[in-house]
Amino acid sequence: MQLTDLIVPTAVATPGMRVADVFRECIAKQVPGIPFRDAKGHIAGKASIRHVLKLNCIPDFMVTHGSILGDQIDELTIPAEKARHVINLAIDDFIIPDPAVIGPHSPVAKALAVMERHNTTYLFVIDGDNYLGTISIMGVGAAALSLGES
């Protein structure tokens, strides 16, 4: 199993890009986030669906007490108006700095170790300043399944 065989090419988020465009790219490529390229052209962070939703759609107390919340909290749903507002925001305020990255010639085991170290399920493959794509735990799992069943 080669790391380069697991790369999913994606677009990068850029300053001023709308949340909707980031979500659309992530959903189309089945990745949880994409890298953020700053105005100087450097990968400066990651734009994550989870992070945007966490900051905009769930109050902190729900995160803190999520395991004891009941299932009848309908008044805390995400209304369409809120969704429209969030997806039209610029992604800039939701960038997580220092994303998990790896070089294209690294072994898959190192990719897994980097994911664990960063407590994430995906990372970006970068060769110098050149972004090649994303590798996810799902991609590694699919490759392992395919390899094991062949």
Cite the ranges covered by each PLM segment.
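Charged, low-complexity, helix/coiled-coil-prone segments
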Residues: 13, 50-61, 81, 87
